[in-house]
Amino acid sequence: MAQAIDLAQLEMMTAGDAELAVEALGIFRQSADMWSRLLDPQADPAQWADAAHGIKGAARSIGAMALGDACEAAETLGRKGTPTRVEAGVAISAVKDELGQALEALAHVEHQLLMRRSFQGVRLDPA
């Protein structure tokens, strides 16, 4: 199973600056909180497609690639016309599942970065 956050991507996007990474993770958390409220399969597909688009960019910027991919699939579905409620529900569920995993990994990574003040030794798996 792929990791929820690609640490190499996060490190590259922040030029190895642990403080910047912590800031980026916080911004992601705030963005995800705002956009995730609009992920409602009962709503207009354009609304949840926009939300998925917003989460997608933020996710990929911190290395949450599986979340970005789930968002891309939901966004594409929402922009294709009128998906069924089942299709919408499945796509949005996938986004929410990946978002939950990313937020859990984010908390773990953020804690380690704050404690270590560097990327050295930061891991996603409990050790």
What is each model feature region?
Residues A15, L77-K80, Q120:
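Feature targets compositionally biased, intrinsically disordered low-complexity regions
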Residues Q3-G54, V86-E110, A127:
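Long, amphipathic alpha-helical coiled-coil segments characteristic
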Residues M1, H111-A127:
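Intrinsically disordered or compositionally simple regulatory linkers and C-terminal tails
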Residues M1-A2, L67:
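Proline-centered turn/helix-capping motifs that create local helix->coil transitions or kinks
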Residues Q47-A51, A59-K80:
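Short, well-ordered alpha-helical segments
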